[in-house]
């Protein structure tokens, strides 16, 4: 090995080990992945990328849709980093092209459109691409007469796109209304965290709203609310279980039971007489 080889950038090796965010136990990364990112020690549900969600929920031979719709730096926005540079870095390092990936496939032989958000892509924030992909996914569900399932995780609207990102709240809500008017079931699966403009738009417009255990779900953060109302909030405030007790979600379902639960709902809502 020469001196230049010594200084040359080495390929990044995958980490063999990881740590549970909840119980702090050290786990084999491969073990966590094969368990669909549910901690085998404490049952904590970690974030999972869209392609793993698709492999867990869908049968083989599904298609990925609308990948040609890509983000644009409309405003030449810069915070700690230029938005254009942030997108370029994500293009090189992320396994998704945006914070939402849309799949067309079958869930236990039932045709569905599946849209899945990715928190690792700028906090799962909703910008113009997320709004447009969700709209097109909903219209495809209407056109093909099959249910739309959306797995949601988000920090809210994408600040780098300013008012354009806020417009997506209206766009996605209208898309859900079109599905409702055409009798197409829309099911949302809320994962940790689901907050901000996404929770204030399509996330809570599902015909059935499912949440994963102990997910943080809400609009503003608990600390912001406490500072505003000057009151102490309940310890389990904004958790899936708290929202279930208050009637804001319909059921709390473990990730390993999600496919069977969705199959039962699809049979009940749409495919019973198929």
From Swiss-Prot:
Cofactor(s) essential for the protein: Zn(2+)
Biological process, per Gene Ontology: fatty acid biosynthetic process; malonyl-CoA biosynthetic process
SUPFAM superfamilies on file: ClpP/crotonase (SSF52096)
GO cellular component term of the entry, any: acetyl-CoA carboxylase complex
Record-linked InterPro entries: AcCoA_carboxyl_beta (IPR034733), Acetyl_CoA_COase_Trfase_b_su (IPR000438), ClpP/crotonase-like_dom_sf (IPR029045), COA_CT_N (IPR011762), Znf-ACC (IPR041010)
NCBIfam families in alphabetical order: accD
Protein name, entry field: Acetyl-coenzyme A carboxylase carboxyl transferase subunit beta
Biological source species: Hydrogenobaculum sp. (strain Y04AAS1)
Gene symbol of the encoding locus: accD
């Amino acid at each position: 090995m020469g001196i230049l080889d010594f200084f040359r950038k080495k390929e990044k090796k995958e980490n063999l080990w990881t740590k549970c965010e909840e119980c702090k136990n050290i786990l084999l990364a491969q073990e966590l992945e094969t368990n669909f990112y549910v901690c085998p020690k404490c049952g904590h549900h970690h974030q999972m990328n869209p392609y793993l969600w698709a492999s867990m929920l869908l049968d083989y031979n599904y298609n990925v849709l609308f990948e040609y719709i890509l983000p644009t730096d409309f405003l030449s926005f810069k915070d700690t980093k230029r938005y254009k540079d942030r997108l370029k870095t994500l293009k090189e390092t992320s396994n998704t092209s945006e914070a939402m990936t849309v799949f067309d496939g079958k869930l236990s032989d039932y045709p569905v459109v599946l849209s899945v958000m990715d928190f690792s892509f700028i906090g799962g924030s909703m910008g113009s691409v997320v709004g447009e992909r969700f709209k097109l996914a909903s219209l495809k569900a209407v056109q093909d007469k099959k249910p739309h399932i959306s797995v949601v995780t988000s920090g809210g609207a994408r600040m780098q796109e300013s008012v354009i990102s806020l417009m997506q709240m209206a766009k996605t809500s209208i898309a859900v209304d079109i599905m409702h008017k055409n009798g197409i079931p829309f099911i949302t699966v809320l994962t940790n965290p689901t907050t901000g403009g996404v929770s204030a738009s399509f996330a809570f417009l599902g015909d059935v709203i499912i949440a994963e255990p102990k997910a943080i779900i809400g609009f503003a953060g608990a600390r912001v609310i406490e500072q505003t109302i000057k009151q102490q909030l309940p310890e389990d405030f904004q958790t899936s279980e708290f929202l279930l007790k208050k009637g804001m979600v319909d059921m709390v379902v473990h990730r390993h039971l999600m496919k069977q639960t969705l199959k039962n709902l699809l049979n009940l809502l749409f495919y019973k007489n198929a």
